[in-house]
Amino acid sequence: MIVVDYITPLMESMKISAYYTIRISIIVLTTVFIVNYIMSTGIMKKLSNMLSPILRRLKVNPLSISSTLACFFSPTVGYSILAEGLKENKVNEREVIGASLANSFPSVLSHTFTFFIPVVVPILGHTGVLYVLIRLGVALAKTIIGFLYLSIISEDYSFEMPEINKLNKKENAKKSFKSTIRFAKRLIPIMFFMMTLVLYLSKIGFFDYVEKFVQPITNLLNLNPNVGILALTEIMNVQAAIVMAGGFLNEGILSSKEVLIGLIIGNVLTFSTRYVKHSLPLHVSLFGAKLGTKIVMVNAAITLLLDIFIIAGLLLI
């Protein structure tokens, strides 16, 4: 009778995972603290002020421009400007939809500093950089589409930039530290668990077994079956998928291109639930059920289309 030893691979996986988690966590949490502190000093507001003279030259509703500039440091503030403008009849529904598209790049850019750079890049390395560039590229394309649409439908108004309050610098360090601790409580357990799981399942041959079930689908796209596992993991938890992707890269299970495809496929699979959970409540509360839903659907559809084009492009490389 053959006795399979499952304990030794588990202990080895936990040991490697603990070392990896400690090493990456130091980098990630230090970066998170620094980025949170810098963001609280109003750097994104300074960036919006720098871009203000350029954007003023666009012949679009000034509230649309104001909303886009505000989204560089607070997407919620940016959309609130549009909501107030709509109530006061200073902006119409079509302009709100166009502005919501135009707000994509500054909104994702702020997310880049709070999640992509401090978390994704340290875990995935150069693959993480490529993933960030892809997400920024999609957002930039949506912003360009939004401004093109606004330039067609908007009237030429006199520009008036709403006053936006700066954050209190005295509370920066304390606020950044608390934010980092909260983030650490979420990230470290997920990182340790997912890295241990990936290493352990790899050692006992689980991924070879799963390949038999996923292979028919992935074979159609000429992909490694583990790409499907990564995409399915992203449906459950984005951070878990990022950590799993890092494990796949470290173990040589997936290539850089396959990780990118897996993460983007996961993004496509989760786009509906993500928009419903995160975007829809905010937009409905600000713009009402009809317009709020329309804004979310337009943004989701364009994001989905662009992601599909990117997946197709990566498959052809």
Swiss-Prot record:
**What does the sequence similarity comment in the record state about its family?**
To M.jannaschii MJ0880, MJ1556 and MJ1589.
- The molecule here is called Uncharacterized protein MJ0871
The subcellular localization recorded is:
Cell membrane
Primary residence: membrane
What InterPro entries does the entry give? Gate_dom, MJ0871-like
Q: Which domain of life is it from?
A: Archaea
Membrane topology recorded in Swiss-Prot or TrEMBL = Multi-pass membrane protein
Higher taxonomy = Archaea, Methanobacteriati, Methanobacteriota, Methanomada group, Methanococci
Q: Which GO terms describe its cellular component?
A: plasma membrane
Q: Could you tell me which species this protein originates from?
A: Methanocaldococcus jannaschii (strain ATCC 43067 / DSM 2661 / JAL-1 / JCM 10045 / NBRC 100440)
* Matching PANTHER family: GATE DOMAIN-CONTAINING PROTEIN, NUCLEOSIDE TRANSPORTER_FEOB GTPASE GATE DOMAIN-CONTAINING PROTEIN
Q: Mind telling me which residue stretches traverse the membrane in this protein?
A: 24-44, 63-83, 136-156, 187-207, 229-249, 252-272, 295-315
